[in-house]
C-alpha cells in the first residue's frame, strides 16, 4: 500500500516528534525512503494524514506506508 500524493509527504522529524510524545507502542522502520507505521489506530496524527490513514484501515492494511521527505 503506497500513497504517492505529494501533499502527504512529511518530514521524518515531524513524525519522530509526534511519536516521542506518544505513550503508544508504535513500531517504526524506515526503508528506501518509506516510513512504516504500525499500531497507530489511536495515535494522534497530523491532519493531512488522518484521511489516508482511515482509508488504509478500510482497505485492511496492517500498517501505513508513507514516503519520507528530508527537509533542510
From Swiss-Prot:
Keywords: Sensory transduction
Tissue specificity remark: Adrenal, cerebral cortex, heart, hypothalamus, intestine, liver, lung, pituitary, retina and testis.
Top-level taxon in the UniProt lineage: Eukaryota
Family the UniProt entry places it in: Belongs to the arrestin family.
Protein name: Arrestin-E
Organism the protein comes from: Rattus norvegicus (Rat)
Gene for this chain: Ear
Amino acid at each position: 500500500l503506497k500513497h504517492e500524493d505529494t501533499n502527504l509527504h512529511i518530514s521524518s522529524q515531524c513524525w519522530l516528534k509526534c511519536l516521542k510524545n506518544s505513550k503508544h507502542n508504535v513500531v517504526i522502520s524506515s526503508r528506501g525512503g518509506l516510513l512504516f507505521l504500525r499500531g497507530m489506530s489511536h495515535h494522534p496524527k497530523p491532519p493531512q494524514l488522518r484521511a489516508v490513514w482511515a482509508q488504509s484501515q478500510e482497505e485492511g492494511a496492517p500498517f501505513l506506508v508513507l514516503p519520507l521527505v528530508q527537509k533542510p
